[in-house]
Amino acid sequence: MPVAKVQAVENRKSFRTKTLRLHPLENRTFDQACEALNDMERTQLMQEAVIQEAARLGVRWTVEPAAPLTSVWPYLPQRGDEPTQVRVSITVSLPVAEIITRAAEHVHASEPMFIIGATLAHIGRLKACFKGIHADTPEEARDIRAALDRIKLPPQYQYPRRGRRRR
């Protein structure tokens, strides 16, 4: 009998797979961002994005629910009539999967649309604010920022650049 119990535990998964249907522009944008960030894996980029956006919205591990939105979530992708052409899957941990579900419900979006919108917004923030202070060299940081700058985003995901600090 103990063998059956051990076997049941071994079959449990610590992750969930999320399938996304992307427009070619979204797919290209995600590829460019991953390449700019020293070939970061797409799943990692998207997990960072959804965690950051969920926290920004107040969706986090707490007993208090997030305050209701006072306006429409601005990062919901505007798809129009153009059909999606690219299907991708990402793998997320169980806690991240739960955060995605809670955040998507909070903004009244499907989980895939929340993931896509949060990731596009994250790329916009990286373009505007990423400094590369942990890059191996100043040249590498400059290359990463330049590659991020070349990414074209729809207007709703563009952020004003922060000015340089004056000393």
Per-region residue spans from a language model:
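Σ70-family region 2.3-2.4 aromatic/basic alpha-helix that recognizes the −10 promoter
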Residues: 19, 47-48, 89
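Short, positively charged interaction helices/loops
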Residues: 55-91, 95-98, 102, 124-167
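Arg/Lys-rich, low-complexity, intrinsically disordered N-terminal tails that contact nucleic acids
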Residues: 1-13
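Short glycine-enriched loop/turn motifs at secondary-structure junctions
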Residues: 11-15, 81-84
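Surface-exposed, Lys/Arg-rich phosphate-binding patches that contact polyanionic backbones
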Residues: 9-10, 23-44, 48, 94-113, ...
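N-terminal coiled-coil initiation/transition segments in long coiled-coil scaffolds
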Residues: 15-21
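The DNA-recognition helices of helix-turn-helix-type DNA-binding domains
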Residues: 37, 52-53, 57, 121-122
